[in-house]
Amino acid sequence: ILYNNLERKGRENMTLEWLAHSCFCLANEEGHRLLIDPYRGEDTGYKEPQLDKVDVVICSHGHMDHANTAVIQNPDYMKIDKAGHFETKGFAIDTVPTYHDDENGTKRGENLVSIVETDGLRFCHCGDLGHVLGKEQVKALGKIDVLMIPVGGLFTIDAKQAAEVVEALDVKIVIPMHYKTEACRYDLAPVEDFLEEMKKSEYAISMYHDSVMHLDGYTIPKRAKVYVMESKY
């Protein structure tokens, strides 16, 4: 897949849906669906989704607000919960080992940052990243079209650290996740803290009043931009 072809490649059916918390569902042009970090309702406070026709699920770590595969109704899906390279259903997936805390995993264990490439676009989901990325990790992630990053602190990087990660990466679209909302039971910081940090670096910010982003050729901005989506649940 050639990165520089992304502006010319048709993606009429490609969508990214934010269900809630850190859970996203990516559908490629072929109609295959990749789910990331499905949550359990009783842990998070969000309504629990019931999903069918999921082809791949990525769990960044084993905590049940990120690894509740019981929400998937069909039995025949591929589960990825370890570091490595995987290819299936039009998705090329690389999972990069990181930590859930800033003490090399001694507090909360390991975490996977996932790179998903499909239909000429590269997506990066940071899971419950607990530390700022090192130079080698940044290099390994490469160019990113859409970044999903936790910003609420407490269990993950906070707003300031998230802004630092964004600054270090070559990214076009930034989608904050894992922050305090009306439904969320965790004592996380609100997304506004992250937006204030991004304004300091003069990033454009858009309130995207939908849970589904249609990833056609006109969606990808030429300059990095923050999109605050509305979750489905």
For every predicted segment, state its role.
Residues 1-13:
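Short, Lys/Arg-enriched N-terminal segments with co-localized hydrophobic residues
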Residues 15-18, 33-37, 92-98, 113-115, ...:
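Active-site-proximal beta-strand elements of phosphoester/diester hydrolases
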Residues 17, 108, 173-233:
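Binuclear metal-ion centers of metallo-dependent hydrolases, dominated by the metallo-beta-lactamase
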Residues 23-59, 66-77, 81, 97-109, ...:
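Pre-active-site segment of Zn-dependent metallo-hydrolases
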Residues 54-55, 145, 172:
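Conserved acidic residues
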Residues 61, 151, 177-179:
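Short secondary-structure boundary segments
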Residues 103-169, 186:
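Active-site-proximal loop/helix segments of hydrolase catalytic cores
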